[in-house]
A protein has these predicted regions:
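Histidine-rich, glycine-flanked metal-binding segment
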Residues: 1-45
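Divalent metal-dependent hydrolysis catalytic cores, especially in the metallo-beta-lactamase
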Residues: 54, 70-99, 112-126, 152-166, ...
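His/Asp/Glu-enriched, well-ordered alpha-helical/loop segment
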Residues: 223-232, 250-263, 267-351
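Active-site core of metal-dependent hydrolases
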Residues: 150-269
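Conserved, mostly hydrophobic/aromatic
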Residues: 41, 119, 175, 204, ...
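Active-site gating loops and adjacent loop-to-helix segments of metal-dependent hydrolytic enzymes
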Residues: 74-85, 126-153, 195-207, 218-231, ...
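Di-metal (Zn2+ and/or Mg2+/Mn2+) metal-binding site signature of metallo-dependent hydrolases
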Residues: 42-64
């Protein structure tokens, strides 16, 4: 495939030129040959990488339903995501284990690629557990992590932990040898967070949500992540984080910012009542809350929505694309995706100047 005359995202900026690819990217620049597509006025960007998504279109990875996996892969691709981490809820080990088996055994027919698992629970603190059932919380447990990772076929790429809980620091030290460890759903202080980062943690789960806010005398995880050089997630639906704070985080953290969807099964679905980890949530005007409360419960947006939102909030398009593709791939060690370079997977999006999706390629195949 040869696409010509596009604005191609390479590194951290756009260049005018052409791109040739098969299953992998073969060449970028001014290329000889007749174009298969003259994409003048369009952008070619890396396929988006969502490292924090629980589900969509009525499906949730924690359900452990094999028949739900392909519809999810198709949904993600249709909304610009070419690689994702299947993200779990805070549930009992006996519920998470069969869900790990389903993810392990999934072989997509088409759509986005499942690049692994994000264990967002159950190693959370009570006070910052979010929209999760308290009875399913568990102290950080290295042996449990290894059992769940084995059940997934060794596919856990990211795990969220409250490092201040009993056993939390040892968990960080040991598990960071296996996958990326993120601090989140935590009551940790600045000093505790800095110790965890020194022990091997390198990421923060949905910054500002599920942690103490930034205080000038108690800076907490938010400042620690900045000082430690950690990558940080943001839910950019316009509900979880004010646009001014998104701009602030972008200015402070730069290319360590990771856009995520944190999407639930309600994404791509109408408003109504849905189930989340054994609890009821209500979605109204796209806002998901625990039923009868104002407690936010994840989002209903796609990653492409997040990109469009942050551009609307004032971020440069190049920075938005980087934060939704290259940065998350780097954060969780996905080496073959997330950027446009020769030899990497031809996971590509073509967007028009309104950021509407014109084409999606996964391993060079149009979806």
């Amino acid at each position: 495939m040869l696409i010509k005359n596009a604005k191609i995202f390479v590194g951290k900026s756009f260049l005018e030129g052409d791109i040739r690819f098969g299953k992998t990217i073969e060449a970028v620049g001014r290329l000889e040959g007749e174009a298969d597509w003259d994409a003048k006025g369009c952008y070619v960007v890396p396929g988006l990488v969502d490292v924090h998504t629980h589900g969509a279109v009525g499906e949730d990875f924690s359900d452990g339903k094999a028949e739900g996996m392909q519809p999810l892969a198709d949904y993600y691709a249709a909304h610009g995501v070419t690689s994702y981490l299947a993200t779990t809820m805070t549930l009992k080990e006996e519920t998470l284990t069969p869900a790990m088996h389903v993810i392990r055994d999934f072989h997509r027919a088409h759509g986005a690629k499942c690049a692994g698992v994000h264990l967002e629970g159950p190693f959370r603190c009570y006070d910052k557990r979010g929209a999760q059932a308290a009875e399913n919380l568990h102290k950080p447990d290295v042996a449990m992590f290894h059992r769940l990772n084995e059940a997934s076929g060794g596919q856990v790429k990211l795990v969220t932990v409250a490092c201040e809980e009993e056993g939390g620091m040892d968990f960080v030290s040991q598990v960071s040898q296996v996958c990326t460890v993120s601090l989140g759903h935590t009551c940790c202080t600045y000093d505790q967070a800095m110790e965890a980062f020194a022990r091997g943690a390198s990421h923060a789960t949905h910054l500002f949500n599920g942690m103490d806010g930034l205080h000038h005398r108690k800076p907490g995880l938010i400042a620690a992540a900045m000082d430690a050089g950690a990558s940080v997630e943001l839910i950019c639906d316009g509900l979880h984080i004010h646009p001014a704070v998104i701009r602030l985080v972008h200015n402070l953290y730069g290319d360590r910012l990771n856009l995520i969807s944190d999407s639930l099964r309600c994404a791509g679905m109408p408003d109504g009542d849905y189930e989340l980890g054994g609890q009821s949530i209500t979605v109204k005007n796209g806002k998901a809350c625990l039923t009868g409360t104002d407690t936010l419960a994840g989002s209903s947006i796609s990653m492409l929505d997040a990109v469009r939102n942050v551009v609307r909030f004032g971020l440069p398009l190049a920075d938005a694309v980087y934060a939704a593709s290259t940065a998350p791939a780097l954060a969780v060690g996905l080496k073959d995706v997330g950027s446009i370079a020769c030899g990497k997977a031809a996971d590509l999006l073509v967007l028009d100047h309104h950021l509407q999706l014109k084409a999606v390629y996964v391993d060079g195949e149009q979806q």
